[in-house]
UniProtKB/Swiss-Prot annotation:
Belongs to the NTAQ1 family. Its EC number is 3.5.1.122. This is Protein N-terminal glutamine amidohydrolase. It comes from Drosophila pseudoobscura pseudoobscura. Disulfide bonds: none annotated. The keyword Repeat does not apply. One of its GO terms (cellular component) is cytosol. It is an enzyme of class 3 (hydrolase). Keywords: Hydrolase. GO terms for molecular function: protein-N-terminal asparagine amidohydrolase activity; protein-N-terminal glutamine amidohydrolase activity.
Length: 205
């Protein structure tokens, strides 16, 4: 496990099961409040695809030895303070909190090569400051047709922006050119945020 003092420990973080998008918003909010100088190096990352069927390993909700689960989408927090240092904070993983980017991606997403195309993962990477401003959810996606909750909501009020009552779908959507941030395939995501020690050494020459 590496050390990163954005968050003292996982127990100090706001967490409600099945509300990963709000859990990550709260992490962004915490950085803005306690470490504002780091906010520009932080991101909210949505994982999904067109069919909203994305397999992830090493998840607390997963089954079997590999702890695999298929989500419609997932969200995690990422801190990228320098070219050779990128850390993932995932409140739903069984991996350490935080985990180095390469280890997290390797164990959580493995490879798309062994998966059917409809299960390939795509990533919407949103700067933390943008996420704090633009994310808005009235939690309608967690209600049944009769109005009851699929999973109990957080005790705090819904996170609503000044311009939109509910825009969660824009963040889950993986169509380039729609929604905030940038959309990457798995290979593009790794290429953009993982720099091996050799690559960093060559860049610094």
């Amino acid at each position: 496990m590496t050390t990163d003092f954005l968050f003292p420990k996982i127990a100090d973080c706001s967490y409600v099961s099945c509300y990963c998008e709000e859990n990550v918003w709260k992490l962004c909010e915490q950085v803005k409040r306690t470490r504002p100088e780091e906010l520009g190096t932080c991101y909210a990352v949505f994982v999904s695809n067109e069919g909203r069927t994305v397999p992830l390993w090493r998840q607390k909700a997963g089954r079997g030895d590999d702890q695999v689960v298929i989500w419609d989408y997932h969200v995690f927090f990422m801190h990228n303070p320098s070219p050779n240092r990128c850390l993932v904070f995932d409140l739903d993983t069984t991996l350490p909190f935080p985990t180095y980017f390469h280890k997290y991606v390797t164990e959580t997403f493995r490879s798309d090569l062994a998966l059917r195309p409809e299960h390939h993962r795509f990533f919407r990477v949103i700067p933390a400051d943008t996420y704090l401003i633009e994310f808005s959810s009235d939690r309608r996606h967690m209600r049944r047709p009769d109005g009851s909750w699929i999973k109990p909501p957080p005790s705090y009020p819904p996170i609503l922006s000044n311009t939109n009552m509910h825009c969660l779908g824009d963040f889950i959507c993986m169509s380039a050119g729609k929604g905030p941030g940038a959309v990457y395939s798995l290979s593009e995501f790794v290429h953009n945020f993982y720099k091996s020690p050799n690559m960093v050494a060559q860049h610094n020459k």
